């Protein structure tokens, strides 16, 4: 029947039947789809006449242009203007290929799916860098491709795209066993070096820093080493500060590096529970883990400082008792809130050990009271402090004149010390020697004078000598 129908169209050769569907040489108004080979032979002549007399759309507009039809005489057809599919509704080639791949003429020409890479190795772009993926995603590098005879390692196109241009570096193989992890880390470090990231891998004795986390209890110390590792990698600006905010905003590449290094050096089975809780919500939120770790380190430092302060308390009344009580109670409350419980007995012993001065006797008056509380101890401290303040206020504030104190000191010395005869100030002007003085005395005794009579009057009276020769004799010496 197909041969009979084709004989009705003298302009169409049997070899170019497919090309005639879109050819401009079709002069009939009959739809070629109505006379296809799928039609049965029961069509009569009446139905054929009815179909031929109908005013239908030209055959060229009913079938869209097929650019890839294997026709020996391809013919170009202008886009339809009045067919059932308007021109503005037809898909363009770019719309049909949103991924931007080259258009393949035959399904057999489409290549197989490329090597499945871990999401952390995706090239930079608008796509998500951290999609969730199961552990089964990805294949080892040794796995052959779907096409026989071609493997990923032997693909020249892959080598030219990934290794020769250095735009994308071949990722390390998939880790399949915990026992292979040491060797896999070496491969990963080699991958970083090939990615021009070898300068950010500090080493100590040939081993990468930070060390591997091997226990949840070692996580606080490991985080300190990891933060030092980031600082050595010129990433100190993204580390959260005391207020929990970094100095600068982290970039996507830095976040990728942060995620990869944390995942390598801190295996999930060795993470503490609170770290796992954060990763269960967002497994890429490494910044939150660092922020919480810094807060815990500060809290641990504060706890150590509080314990040292409480063990070395000293009080002698030089500061107000209220300030001393506030300081001690705040330290005890902080330690109790952080899980370090200080009971009343221990607290009272630490407080009483630091008391001195008038407060020292509290060690002995209260030592028998086993149920004494910190509040009761501070009641006694307040009582002593108020008594000290009252005694200081009752003392007179009069200050003696310095001149009065000077006069009192003079009179005191005159009454206690024996009176000393002062020498004549003219002594310094007398330059006579002792021999000359003796000669004068002897001559004065031989010569008659009234002074000799006064000397010989009585031996019991004190001897009085003129002060002519500056001689002074004490009566008790004779």
Swiss-Prot record:
The record marks 439-440 as: Cleavage. Capsid protein (CA) is the structural component of the virus-like particle (VLP), forming the shell that encapsulates the retrotransposons dimeric RNA genome. The particles are assembled from trimer-clustered units and there are holes in the capsid shells that allow for the diffusion of macromolecules. CA also has nucleocapsid-like chaperone activity, promoting primer tRNA(i)-Met annealing to the multipartite primer-binding site (PBS), dimerization of Ty1 RNA and initiation of reverse transcription. The C-terminal RNA-binding region of CA is sufficient for all its nucleocapsid-like chaperone activities. Signal peptide: none annotated. Residues 153-165, 440-456 have a biased composition (Low complexity). The lineage of its organism: Eukaryota, Fungi, Dikarya, Ascomycota, Saccharomycotina. It is found in: Cytoplasm. It comes from Saccharomyces cerevisiae (strain ATCC 204508 / S288c) (Baker's yeast). GO terms for molecular function: RNA binding. One of its GO terms (cellular component) is cytoplasm. One of its GO terms (biological process) is viral translational frameshifting. This is Transposon Ty1-H Gag polyprotein. The keyword Cytoplasm applies. It comes from the Eukaryota. Keywords: Cytoplasm, RNA-binding, Transposable element. Residues 1-10, 48-60, 127-152, 457-466 have a biased composition (Polar residues). InterPro entries: TYA (IPR015820). Homotrimer. Residues 1-84, 126-174, 390-478 are annotated as: Disordered. Residues 467-478 have a biased composition (Basic and acidic residues). Retrotransposons are mobile genetic entities that are able to replicate via an RNA intermediate and a reverse transcription step. In contrast to retroviruses, retrotransposons are non-infectious, lack an envelope and remain intracellular. Ty1 retrotransposons belong to the copia elements (pseudoviridae). Residues 337-439 are annotated as: RNA-binding.
